[in-house]
Amino acid sequence: MPCCDPYPWIGLNVGRLSSFPLLKYPQVRRWLAPFIVACSLYFLLWIPEDQPSWVSALVKCQPILCLVLFLWAVAPGGSYTWLLQGALTCSAVGDACLIWPEAFFYGMAVFSVAHLLYLWAFGLSPLQPGLLLCTTLASLTYYSFLLLHLEPNMVLPVAAYGLILNTMLWRGLVLGRSAGWGAVLFIFSDGVLAWDTFVYTLPFARLVTMSTYYAAQLLLTLSALRSPGLKTH
């Protein structure tokens, strides 16, 4: 009988712990449990998007807030961890804003701050301008189609957000490992959301967007544990 996967968001089961060494630490598994439960609650409840409320906002934000708690409990201190906590907190606020269509601009602004904090954490060394050229060409190809479908008042904010997001992707890829994969999933999630919102309604768009978004935030969070020195309790 196949083994039940207790950590579906990172593709891990108890028979494959060696594929993600960090999960060998009991405190990592213990403090990831609230995130797994919160994600499961979001997808099980699946509150309709046309019924915005503070309850739906809380359910949507809970997994991200659990990651803030995870970093506080497990990650070593330092500017990298603090910047990630700030980025996650901004992301949770952005998630809440996006529940209400009239708060879309506020949500985009707060997510821009989150990406800037991720960018600050990742740093600018080594530079690797060739990688920046590749990500920029890919982003320009996507946004050249997307911007054609936007209202005039949306063009500048979306273009600015795309620039920040592309820069975060570049630095995440330079850092590599879970930060790189997290950045890729984040830009994929945002790309699906934007296309579904502004261009063409996609099947299962919300499921794809939210599953990749939560996975992206988890991977970005785990990048804080890339160096030894987990907290002990």
Swiss-Prot record:
It is a multi-pass membrane protein. It catalyses: a 1-O-(1Z-alkenyl)-sn-glycero-3-phosphocholine + H2O = a 2,3-saturated aldehyde + sn-glycerol 3-phosphocholine; a 1-O-(1Z-alkenyl)-sn-glycero-3-phosphoethanolamine + H2O = a 2,3-saturated aldehyde + sn-glycero-3-phosphoethanolamine. GO terms for biological process: ether lipid metabolic process. Competitively inhibited by lysophosphatidic acid. It is an enzyme of class 3 (hydrolase). It is found in: Endoplasmic reticulum membrane; Cytoplasm. Keywords: Cytoplasm, Endoplasmic reticulum, Hydrolase, Lipid metabolism, Membrane, Transmembrane, Transmembrane helix. Pfam families: YhhN (PF07947). Coiled coil: none annotated. GO terms for molecular function: alkenylglycerophosphocholine hydrolase activity; D-lysine 5,6-aminomutase activity; identical protein binding. Optimum pH is 7.0 with both ethanolamine and choline as substrates. Fifty percent of maximal velocity occurs at pH 5.5 and pH 8. Its main location: endoplasmic reticulum. The chain crosses the membrane at residues 31-47, 54-75, 82-100, 107-124, 131-147, 154-170, 179-195, 207-225. Residues 1-30, 76-81, 125-130, 171-178, 226-233 are cytoplasmic. Belongs to the TMEM86 family. Catalyzes the hydrolysis of the vinyl ether bond of choline or ethanolamine lysoplasmalogens, forming fatty aldehyde and glycerophosphocholine or glycerophosphoethanolamine, respectively and is specific for the sn-2-deacylated (lyso) form of plasmalogen. This is Lysoplasmalogenase TMEM86B. The gene is Tmem86b.
